From Swiss-Prot:
Comp. bias regions, Basic and acidic residues: 415-430
SMART domains: DM7
Region (Disordered) location: 415-443
Family membership noted in the UniProt record: Belongs to the DM7 family.
Leader sequence segment: none
Superkingdom classification of source: Eukaryota
Name of the protein in its database record: DM7 family protein GG17591
Keywords from the UniProt entry: Repeat
Protein's UniProt keywords contain Repeat: yes
Length: 542
């Protein structure tokens, strides 16, 4: 029997252990497996005096020691609990996986301040002992404990599945008489049923924590069906903070210009709630189907006596994040314009559609072999060569248009040498005709090859060296607006020319990073590092 909540602890937060009458050895205490993988790190668990006995020798030995502590959340205790009476324990006496924790001895907590659902309804005598602990951020349990928890299964009392249990109506005071809503003609008691939501893709942050706050509570009930045995003008239903969480967009809609239809609540049933406890009316698009207006009472706004008097034995349980306070409540006005529809039939249709889809997905006829998702690598560079066979790492190409279609953006062609022209300037006119013939012949002998973006850069550079003087340019500069073509080509040329130097610099950076990581690891483990670094320096010199 336990409850969990979120929390953290500052490093170095300790307190002195004073003389105590109850200090049990809880190293063998094991929590449910889901708690070790949950984002909630604080747990409140009931202890048993006959099992978790006081260790007198440990209490005398650790008296005066500094023990880790943390701030105990008051929201987990109803009423004004004496949280200052907690006794924080030494780390060696804590359960596995905990960095801090403390205990309330037998009878230390008053019965009215003891967490709800951690004691039996007919419990008599002093309150049982209680353990409050803060789990480490990452816990690695022994394999034996892991196998034991797998065999035992999950415990039902976890943070995500706590069910708020109402006290029975016969537990009211004798002079008070239950006025349950099921006995009235103007109100009906409904049960909120959530339609099955479509599967969502897995989140890259599986342990993302959404903080639970109850300053305002505005859920989205558009996907909720209200199941009622009798149709009345107004209906009341208990909501779930797990299935119907707070939605900030709904809160913004209630504060904006969007219309929120209102109605008057029966004054003989609902108390006058003002301020933060007032009912919040929702916009029509966030109401359940078949309702023209509705409002919600946030968790803790209505007293437990109200639930005991007006809900009583007919109140359907709903999972809650916090059972120390009363659950949220929905009060809705059924639409008279829209014809009432059969909710059970709608539910059956939803289940039938879900089952048929599941059967079709699981049948052999519907299963198709998965095709490998091979991404098509885009092109990068087009090169003019004088050989019909493409160079190593390249592929043949017919035209520049085909290269653009493959994604190529850079073209490389052989540059014209001007050394002969500078040495014999007087022979330019005589050789003009011969150059034209050579150019026409060379155009016929040129072939196109293209390289992918992940091709070997060494093969591309070697091919460019074999060409002699290679000139790079963009195939279609107009297709790249806002790109400085000259700067891009200059950087690409530097990559081709200085690729070996770039690799050496990266290798040196990785080498230095490994050196620092090993040094920090040795320092953290408090191991001798002189011999290690001498050996490391010898390897570097070699």
């Amino acid at each position: 029997m336990l409850q969990v909540a979120s929390g953290n602890r500052e490093e170095g937060q300790v307190v002195e252990l004073k003389k105590t009458k109850y200090l049990p050895y809880l190293f063998n205490l094991v929590m449910p497996k889901s708690f070790y993988h949950s984002h909630n790190r604080i747990v409140v668990a009931r202890l048993y005096s006959n099992v978790h006995k006081h260790d007198k020798q440990a209490a005398e030995f650790f008296e005066g020691f500094q023990t880790p502590c943390f701030e105990v959340p008051a929201s987990m205790f109803p009423g004004e609990a004496p949280l200052n009476k907690i006794v924080f324990m030494p780390p060696v006496m804590l359960p596995m996986g905990f960095e801090a924790g403390g205990v309330f001895g037998p009878g230390v907590l008053p019965r009215r301040s003891y967490p709800i659902d951690l004691t039996a309804s007919g419990h008599k005598g002093q309150s049982p002992p209680l353990f409050v602990g803060l789990r480490r951020l990452y816990v690695q349990l022994p394999s034996e404990i892991e196998s034991f928890l797998d065999k035992m299964g999950e415990f039902p009392a976890t943070q995500d599945t706590l069910v708020y249990g109402m006290r029975r109506s016969n537990q009211l005071l004798k002079e008070e008489q239950a006025q349950e809503l099921m006995l009235r003609n103007d109100l009906s008691l409904s049960m909120a049923y959530n339609l099955p939501a479509p599967p969502t893709p897995p989140s890259p942050y599986p342990y993302r924590h959404v903080p639970v706050q109850y300053n305002i509570y505005t859920p989205d009930l558009s996907n909720v069906l209200m199941m009622m045995p009798h149709q009345r003008k107004l209906t009341v239903a208990i909501l779930s903070t797990v299935n119907n969480p707070h939605v900030p967009s709904v809160a913004l809609a209630t504060m904006g210009d969007e219309e929120c239809p209102k109605f008057e609540l029966p004054s003989d049933v609902f108390p006058i709630c003002e301020g933060v406890n007032r009912p919040i009316f929702l916009p029509r698009r966030f109401l359940p189907k078949g309702f023209e207006s509705g409002c919600v009472f946030k968790p803790g706004s209505l007293s437990e006596l109200w639930f005991m008097g007006y809900m009583g034995r007919f109140s359907p349980p709903q999972p809650q994040h916090n059972c120390a306070i009363t659950p949220p409540l929905f009060v809705g006005k059924i639409s008279r314009v829209v014809l009432a529809f059969d909710l059970m039939k709608n539910i059956q249709m939803e289940y039938g559609a879900a089952q048929s889809s599941a059967q079709s997905e699981g049948s052999l006829n519907a299963v198709e072999p998965k095709k490998p998702n091979v991404p098509i690598t885009k092109g990068f560079l087009v090169m003019e060569t004088e050989h019909p066979t493409p160079p190593s790492g390249g592929y043949s190409l017919q035209s520049y248009q085909e290269g653009s279609a493959k994604g190529c953006v850079v073209k490389v062609e052989k540059g014209e040498t001007q050394e002969m022209d500078e040495a014999h300037p007087t022979k330019e006119e005589s050789k003009s005709e011969e150059e034209g013939e050579v150019q026409s012949g060379s155009q016929e002998e040129k072939y196109l090859s293209w390289f992918k973006v992940d091709s070997d850069i060494d093969l591309i550079a070697e091919t460019m060296v074999d060409m002699g003087t290679a000139q790079m340019s963009l195939i279609d500069e107009e297709a790249l607006p806002g790109v400085d073509g000259a700067c891009v080509l200059n950087q690409l040329r530097e990559v081709f020319e200085d690729r070996n130097e770039i690799r050496q610099n990266i290798d040196q950076l990785i080498h230095d990073h490994i050196y620092r990581m090993n040094r920090d690891r040795m320092l953290a483990l408090r191991l001798p590092i002189r011999s290690y670094f001498r050996m490391y320096d010898k390897v570097d010199n070699q």
